[in-house]
Amino acid sequence: SLLERQMLEQTSAVAAAAAAKGVDILVTEDAVVASDPGNSGEASSVDVGAIPKDQMMLDIGPRTIARFTERIADAGSLIWNGPMGMCEVPAFAAGTNAVARAIAESGAYSIVGGGDSVAAVMSLGLADRFDHVSTGGGASLELLEGKVLPGVAILG
């Protein structure tokens, strides 16, 4: 994804609100990068602040995987929406696969949403280890926000 500079102010506000409530926001420390998704042979792991201009982030790196999976193991409930990287390319699926496995093994109440995340969970044979699986990623998040979904509204 490209950096959306217009979102930086909102991101700072969310980070400040989270800090005020004692909530940790986990961010990527390192990334698996390559100049093109088709060039997986040249992929390397670098700190996120050191991604070369001619490279793109295609997955989370090993330090980030370790930190995310450690925190997942301690969670009581988890909502996951969206893959960690370009998981449809095997060379860039490690982060998504590790998160899926960690959630499945965590024992936490777990929800996975979004087509790519659900596809990864299904391909790993882990769907039955999640409490709720929905291909509606954005819609799932809107429902959790309390928004009325058009398809649900018409029912009632």
Question: What do the predicted segments below correspond to?
Answer:
Residues S1-G156:
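Active-site loop-to-helix "anion-binding N-cap" substructures in soluble metabolic enzymes
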